[in-house]
Regions:
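Cleavable N-terminal export/targeting peptides
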Residues: 1-19, 237
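Outer-membrane beta-barrel translocator domains and adjoining extracellular loop/strand segments
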Residues: 32-37, 66-70, 94-101, 139-145, ...
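Glycine- and aromatic-enriched membrane insertion/assembly motifs of diderm outer-membrane
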Residues: 38-84, 159-166, 176
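Transmembrane beta-strands of outer-membrane beta-barrel proteins
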Residues: 19-25, 44-46, 53-59, 74, ...
Length: 237
């Protein structure tokens, strides 16, 4: 009750800083991986205070094959964003521990902690550079002795912008900081360029209502596959 009262009090005090969004997609793409396919919904809610924020992110499929619930905290200013995500994918067919939400034991947990950083050069040079590392959790070596610290770095550039149409390109590379004797990392079967993406976004206007639409083509040379995503944002505030 005390924790609930604190959360409720924070919401009442900083209600104007609460933000949320919900998207529908034909799949869930992430760092060269197709996490889920089918009718996918993803949404989040977060509380902002000055340059800091804390929130929850969830995703799932209509048939229940994919289920995910994450917590995150972050800091942002004009150019830099830093985040720490606590990620738990508890899909029914998972090959890891998907039944103990609060188990953080490194050798047993089904979750992982993901450190994320993004830096945008400037408004004139809309180039984003990003470094992301799995710092704990189910990113283990074959013997389950140590973490691999799998890392994904990428550069993203705003290629074209006219009115409300945007086209972005992204090049991503994955590797592990600690995987002696092994090739694979959390994101691909070996180190290499595992994401080449082209992303197009434009809102669809229906009366006074705008529905942001997205088209995302993603190629993964390392794992020899290509994927396409369509998305629509149902609401945001």
């Amino acid at each position: 009750m005390i924790i609930f009262s604190m959360i409720t009090g924070s919401i009442l005090l900083y209600g104007q800083e609460i933000h949320s969004a919900l998207q529908l997609r034909n799949n869930h793409l992430w760092r060269g991986i197709e996490v889920a396919s089918g009718l996918v919904y993803t949404g989040d809610i977060h509380l902002d205070y000055k340059n800091f924020y804390v929130g929850f992110w969830a995703g799932g499929t209509a048939n229940g094959d994919y289920k995910e619930f994450n917590n995150y905290i972050g800091y942002k200013n004009k150019h830099l964003t830093l985040e720490l995500w606590d990620i738990y994918n508890f899909s029914p067919n998972a090959t890891y521990n998907n039944k103990e939400f609060f188990n953080y034991n490194a050798k047993e947990t089904g979750r992982f902690m993901d450190f994320r950083s993004y830096y945008t050069i400037s408004d004139r040079i809309p180039l984003m550079l990003s470094w992301n590392t799995v710092i704990s959790g189910r990113d283990r070596n074959k013997e389950n002795i140590h973490n691999k610290y799998s890392t994904f770095v990428f550069a993203e550039y705003l290629v074209y912008k006219k009115d409300d149409l945007e086209v972005r390109g992204r090049l991503g590379y994955s590797f592990a900081l600690n995987n002696p004797g092994e090739q694979s990392n959390f994101f691909s079967k070996k180190a290499g360029f595992n994401e080449i993406s082209l992303m197009i976004s434009k809102p669809l206007t229906i009366g006074s209502y705008k529905i942001p639409l997205g088209l995302w083509g993603m190629w993964n040379p390392v794992d020899n596959r290509a994927l396409l995503q369509f998305s629509a944002q149902v609401y945001s505030f």
